[in-house]
């Protein structure tokens, strides 16, 4: 298992809509993820996502998820609500964060 953190901006005028849609995530989207949490930081309007990856090949698994039509539909709704960080890696939407501490 690998812990993953990621950050993205959210447009302030879209925060309530983002919360509403995430209160009822589609089953087809939920079937592709587990152990996932998204936090909102205001007034900076940042989303911090945390999830646990349980696979062996992150690149292949994330490409498979990205190819899923329902996931693409979900992203098409939510991407306009978000503001990617300029410092993100090329090709990424969310900026991945480095884990610097963990304890059980």
What residues fall within each predicted segment?
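Basic/polar N-terminal segments that are highly enriched at the extreme N-terminus
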Residues: 1, 102-104
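Eukaryote-biased recognition of C-terminal alpha-helical segments
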Residues: 92-101
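An amphipathic, aromatic/His-enriched active-site/gating alpha helix that lines ligand/cofactor pockets
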Residues: 32, 54-93
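Short amphipathic alpha-helical segments
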Residues: 14-35
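Active-site-flanking beta-strand signature of metal-NTP-handling nucleotidyl enzymes
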Residues: 3-9
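A general secondary-structure signal for short beta-strands and their flanking turns/coil
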Residues: 1-3, 44
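Short, glycine- and small/hydrophobic-rich beta-strand elements in well-ordered beta-sheets
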Residues: 30-48, 52-56
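Hydrophobic pocket/interface hotspot
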Residues: 6, 18, 22, 49
């Amino acid at each position: 298992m690998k812990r993953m953190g990621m950050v993205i901006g959210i447009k302030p005028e879209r925060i309530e809509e983002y919360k509403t849609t995430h209160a009822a995530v589609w089953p087809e989207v939920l079937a592709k993820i587990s152990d996932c949490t998204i936090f909102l930081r205001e007034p900076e309007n940042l989303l911090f996502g945390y999830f646990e990856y349980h696979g062996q090949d992150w690149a292949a698994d994330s490409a498979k998820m990205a190819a899923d039509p329902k996931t693409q539909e979900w992203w098409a709704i939510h991407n306009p609500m978000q503001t990617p960080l300029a410092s993100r890696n090329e090709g990424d939407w969310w900026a991945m964060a480095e884990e610097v501490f963990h304890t059980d």
